A protein has these predicted regions:
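Extended, aromatic/histidine-rich regions of cofactor-dependent oxidoreductases associated
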Residues: 2-11, 295-408, 415, 467-578
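A glycine-rich, hydrophobic loop/mini-helix early in the fold
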Residues: 403-456
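Alpha-helical support elements that line or immediately flank enzyme active sites
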Residues: 419, 458-466
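Helix N-cap / beta->alpha transition motif
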Residues: 428, 457-460, 490, 502
Length: 578
């Protein structure tokens, strides 16, 4: 504190009685961005409304849930999709169970929010305005206690206590800006399967991915309740939200398992991310309340005009109130308008919002791959006792061929490999096993938020594809399932589920075609007899009940041209690393 006091003394000429324009502008931008982040965060959370402190996500082990549904521990009786909540567009962004677009909005706005936060913090220290919220003496604590007692007595400290904030406000603002925000930033990356797989040590700092997710949620909840106090507090939670966000990407988590271990595991990071969101919600409520309860005339004059109330005229104060009302109306209009604009044309929104995130993805997460196997992140002791599923095996209406093969224990099943190849080939399960096998213990990451660890046995995709020779123009691999996609976004009849695999994933050692799970033949409910595993990505790329592999020229020529069934119907992104 002595060093800070010396710095404060040296910066004594800084005017703290007025609020410079840059401070007011960055605060307003932050206010708008936080609204977007909270509402899109609710959309993501509603997809799996449960929070855990462990990676296994076993029903009953959650520490917080927003559903009354009871989940059977018999795999397949209750799916993760059954657990999804449908929120109104007035509540979440965009609403109506559109998690794909919710994730897109969350990613895009996070980047804008970070840039605005960087500008704010840089100017805060560059201009000496940091003294507004950084304590420089230990006396801050007894002074804050005195302020708290005044508030608890339902009284308001006199205006002399505010320079420009009283001790309690200053302490709270410091906590939000320099403690909670970094915690939110720190837990955010852990939501990425790529990040968590690449930096498992980082995840362990937060115990595990689900703990990080829970912390992230609590940060959001705190903000929602606290918003009324002061927008400045946002930047304590912000860094933590940012840090845990990438861990939600399977690619990031798999590429940096050490980073994931900083948060203990991926679910711990997810919880931390939630805690940050909760913190923001609490902060917003508290901030707004104090602005209009504790000396509102002074607060409004400072926020809108940057001037002291005693130095302005009645007309100027009226102008400040008008500006405040307009600002709030504009913010609410943007929040609600974004939902209805998104829902008015789902495909357009998917292309625009996900497309806007691509430059940042190309510089960051898309450069990473999971290294869970190479780093031996998990052992057999880590295998989950329960694994969620979000689809059910093919029905007779979807594939009579599959039902016939299943009746004879898949003895006549042959995997087809064709498309743009010189000669198509097919393989039985035994023939695939004869080509070679690998055993990987990895964490499955669903874009809904749940995780599970299992031991997978199969053949590396790149080794299998050596059995055929692609022709010129073969750039992507398409995996097609016996099963159908669960729904289509525009109500069309469902079609066989497919996903297109990027060449960079095909060469990944953690990309395998699995026929075994936990030392047993792959159970039907988890995709037997064959399923794709691509642990740098979210689960929707890992096709179950694989019927055929084929080389294609361009994924834009298949289906709706988005790269797979979940991209076509669920409006997800082709590269599922984040």
């Amino acid at each position: 504190m002595h060093a800070l006091a010396a710095m404060a003394s040296a910066a004594g000429a800084v005017d703290l009685d007025t609020f410079p324009a840059w401070l007011r502008i960055t605060h307003f931008i932050n206010f708008i961005m936080m609204g977007f982040l909270i509402r899109s965060g609710w959309e993501v959370l509603a997809s799996h409304p449960r929070l855990y402190w462990n990676n296994h996500c076993t029903p009953g082990s959650e520490w917080l849930k927003f559903t009354k549904d009871k989940v059977s521990t018999v795999p397949g009786e209750f799916t993760a999709r059954n657990d999804q909540r449908n929120l109104h567009p007035l509540i979440s962004l965009p609403g109506r169970a559109q998690i794909g677009l919710g994730r897109a909005w969350h990613a895009l706005v996070t980047a804008i929010w970070l840039i605005n936060g960087l500008v704010y913090v840089t100017l805060l220290f560059g201009t000496g305005q940091w003294r507004r919220i950084v304590p420089t003496s230990w006396s801050i604590f007894p002074e804050a206690w005195e302020s708290a007692k005044i508030y608890m007595g339902l009284q308001i400290p006199s205006i002399e206590h505010f320079q420009p904030y009283d001790a309690l406000q200053k302490l709270m603002y410091f906590t939000v800006v320099f403690i909670v925000a970094p915690l939110m930033i720190a837990t955010g990356p852990i939501m990425s399967p790529t990040f968590a797989g690449r930096f498992p040590g980082y995840v362990k700092l937060f115990r595990n991915r689900q703990t990080a997710r829970s912390i992230h949620f609590l940060g959001m909840a705190f903000y929602c309740v606290f918003v009324v106090i002061h927008v400045a507090l946002v930047f304590i939670v912000a860094p933590l939200m940012i840090a845990t966000g990438p861990i939600m990407s399977p690619t990031f988590a798999g590429r940096f398992p050490g980073y994931v271990k900083i948060f203990r595991n991926r679910q711990t990071a997810r919880s931390i991310h939630f805690l940050g969101m909760a913190f923001y919600c609490f902060f917003v409520v508290m901030h707004v309340a104090l602005v209009f309860i504790v000396h509102p005339k002074y607060n409004i004059a400072h926020m809108m005009l940057g001037e002291n109330y005693n130095d302005i005229t009645a007309a100027q104060f009226a102008q400040a109130v008008t500006m405040l009302v307009i600002g709030i109306v504009v913010a609410i209009a943007l929040w609600i308008g974004a939902s209805y604009w998104s829902l008015s044309n789902l495909r357009r929104t998917q292309r625009w919002i996900w497309g806007a995130t691509q430059p940042i993805r190309a510089l960051t997460i898309d450069r990473l791959k999971s290294r869970q196997v190479a780093k031996k992140t998990f052992t057999e002791d880590d295998i989950s006792p329960f694994h969620w599923v979000n689809t059910r095996p093919p029905t007779k209406e979807q594939s009579e061929e599959y039902i016939t093969l299943r009746e004879d224990d898949f003895k006549d099943f042959r995997l087809e490999i064709g498309g743009l190849v010189e000669e198509e080939k097919s393989f039985s399960i035994d023939e695939l096993k004869a080509l070679g096998k690998v055993t990987n213990i990895t964490m499955h990451t669903c874009m809904q938020g749940w995780t599970g660890i299992a031991k997978w046995e199969g053949i590396r995709l790149k080794d299998l594809l050596e059995q055929v020779t692609p022709t010129e123009g073969a750039h992507y691999l398409m995996a097609t399932s016996f099963g159908h996609v669960g729904h289509t976004y525009d109500g069309r009849p469902t079609e066989p589920y497919y996903e297109c695999i990027d060449p960079s994933m095909i060469d990944d050692d953690e990309c395998i075609l699995a026929w075994g799970m936990n030392d047993e033949p792959l159970p039907e409910v988890y995709g037997g007899p064959l399923r794709l595993r691509a642990d740098s990505q979210h689960g929707y790329k890992m096709v179950k009940w694989v019927r055929r592999l084929e080389w294609i020229h361009d994924y834009h020529d298949v289906g709706d041209g988005q790269g797979g069934s979940r991209e076509d119907s669920g409006l997800q992104h082709y590269d599922a690393r984040a």
